[in-house]
A protein has these predicted regions:
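Short Gly/Thr/Asp-enriched flexible loops that form oxyanion-binding sites at enzyme active sites
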Residues: 42-47, 128-142, 202
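Accessory alpha-helical/coil subdomains and C-terminal extensions
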Residues: 124-126, 136, 164-182, 189-289
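Short, acidic/small-residue loops that bind anionic groups at enzyme active sites
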Residues: 56-60, 138-170, 215-219
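Glycine-rich oxoanion-binding loops at beta->alpha junctions
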Residues: 10-11, 16, 21, 69-124, ...
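Short glycine-rich or small-residue beta-strand-to-loop segments that form or flank ligand, phosphate
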Residues: 27-35, 91-96, 121-124, 189-192, ...
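Short, ordered loop/turn segments at secondary-structure junctions
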Residues: 33-36, 62-68, 97-98, 127-129, ...
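C-terminal non-catalytic interaction/assembly regions of soluble proteins
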Residues: 267, 271-368
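N-terminal phosphate-binding or glycine-rich loops at protein starts, especially the Walker A/P-loop
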Residues: 21-70
Length: 368
């Protein structure tokens, strides 16, 4: 024991336990919240494999994110039931954008339902919203750990998130394929990728795919400059261009972010979409060149995770179950350099990890 304060277990101490004891066998819950992400199943597999085989824990999987513990929808997870899931995309537990903090008596409902399942703690795998809820629940006294995931790679407290590498590979392959049709038809092809607040996917896939312009949320763009770069390529005899744009990118005056039906989820996020189509119309009208838009959308979330994402997700899952064994509630395993370290959950949601100006400036060398 290291002397750090421990949050009490949900399960009342039995005759075998006088109180929280490091390395005792425990009963843990696990859930996956928010958008699905390649590598989620690798985390689940690692938690179950080490939790059951090494620590002797019992593992419960909640269905559909925070909705599972709110509605007591769960299943027992075993080594056998999680075999073969390592290469699978998505999550065997399902997911949702349910926000327990927005539900009437949500905290007390969670506390009551987790006690009813006789849990000692809960591991929440998710992004900004899921981990934000987990951090708030920890402050309410619930024994919760987090595992960071997002294809957007924008979580604070960690140098990288699993799912990002797979998303970049998918987007890069799409850009490679679109190059051939753009060149064949002398078209401007706009490729819209995910990235609400951070342009990591756009930047990395654009660089890897040889994009001629990359637009990200961190750098409001000048549509006139975008058109100038495209026209310069034409003047040099390059009659096609690839423009990669993150869904959250906006022009300098902030008027081209387009919302899909104005809908929001339970965490208050508006549904983004349409920036690619607006760019297509603006570029065609300003340059006279034929333009087309491809929105990659959810294909970036799906499919088989890359080897890098499988390994990172596995390492995070192993670290999470070890932290739960040591009752390190309110913490989150994070990638720091090449090491996995525990950091406070609050660090993950304190601020977004965005693209540094120098990274974007390096990409600008290849524009036009």
């Amino acid at each position: 024991m290291d002397g750090r304060p421990r949050t009490a277990s949900l399960r009342p101490p039995g005759p075998w336990r006088a109180g929280p004891v490091c390395c005792s066998s425990v009963r843990l819950g696990v859930l996956t919240g928010g958008g699905d992400c390649p590598g989620l199943n690798a985390v689940i597999r690692a938690i179950v494999r080490k939790g059951v085989d090494h620590h002797g824990h019992a593992i419960v999987g909640f269905r559909d994110g925070w909705r599972g513990p709110l509605e007591s929808a769960y299943e027992e997870l075993t080594v056998e039931s999680t075999r073969g899931i390592l290469p699978r995309g998505g999550t065997i537990l399902g997911s949702s954008r349910t926000n327990p903090l927005k539900r009437p008596d949500g905290v007390e409902t969670l506390r009551r339902n987790l006690e009813g399942v006789h849990l000692d703690g809960l591991i929440a795998i998710g992004g900004e919203d899921t981990l934000g809820a987990a951090s708030a629940l920890h402050e309410e006294g619930l024994p919760v750990l987090g595992v960071p995931k997002t294809i957007d790679n924008d979580l604070g407290g960690t140098d990288a998130t699993f799912g990002f590498d797979t998303a970049v590979h998918v987007a890069t392959e799409a850009i490679d394929r679109l190059h051939t049709t753009a060149e064949s038809h002398n078209r401007i092809l706009i490729v819209e990728v995910m990235g609400r607040h951070a342009g990591w996917i756009a930047l990395h896939s654009g660089l890897a795919g040889g994009a001629d312009v990359i637009l990200i949320p961190e750098r409001p763009f000048d549509i006139a400059e975008v058109c100038r770069l495209i026209e310069r390529r034409h003047a040099r005899g390059r009659y096609f261009s690839i423009v990669v744009v993150a869904e959250g990118a906006v022009p300098a005056e902030g008027t081209m972010e387009v919302l899909a039906e104005g809908q929001t989820d339970e965490f208050g996020h508006v549904r983004l979409g349409g920036i690619g189509q607006r760019l297509e119309r603006e570029i065609e009208s300003r340059t006279g060149f034929e333009a087309r838009t491809t929105v990659l959308g959810y294909v970036q979330r799906g499919g088989t995770p890359t080897a890098f994402d499988r390994v990172l997700a596995t390492r995070l899952g192993l670290a999470a179950v070890d932290a739960a064994t040591e009752l390190r509630w309110g913490m989150m395993p994070a990638l720091r350099g090449t090491r996995i370290e525990l950091v406070p959950l609050a660090d993950a949601v304190a601020e977004l990890r965005t693209v540094p100006p120098e990274d974007y400036e390096a990409a600008e060398v290849f524009f036009g």
